[in-house]
Amino acid sequence: MRRVIELTALDRVDGNAVEALLDRALGSDRHGRTAYRLRAGTAAIPALSLAALDNGALVATIQCWPVVFSADDGRVVPITLLGPVAVEPGRQRDGIGRMLMAACLDAAARAGLDDAVMLIGDPEYYERFFGFTAERTAGWRLPGPVERHRLLARGAGVP
């Protein structure tokens, strides 16, 4: 029997369940990571923050955040920060994360928020399936450490 994964708005899911999933998938030490520092003090974009449910049980989440890039020449460029993408450890490699990514990027396009999207993640995976690269991020300064090859972006508006 084939499982049917239901996607829903993240704000329709219990916040404690989301936090517990994030702990299991990413570790309880995740709050000190650079991506968390980047989005500190901002609210997630509701239309781009989704949950995946399997028979009502939370199995994965994705969130996006509005951030800005301040260029050395004074330009301020709005960027959509994608992540975290969290999948229940026992369900990883089931295609749920890829399904969430596709739905999130489609929603970003519909909302006009796909001109500049960034994330920190596995370069082979995110380039192969979604076109993210580190080509334009080498000179970016972030509020914490990051492995440069994992700082990825896509979109015509990426500085």
Predicted feature residues:
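Conserved glycine-rich acetyl-CoA-binding loop
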Residues: 57, 75, 88-99, 111
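Conserved beta-strand in the GNAT
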Residues: 49-51, 57-68, 78-86
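Conserved acetyl-CoA-binding loop-helix of GNAT-fold acetyltransferases
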Residues: 82, 87, 93-106, 119
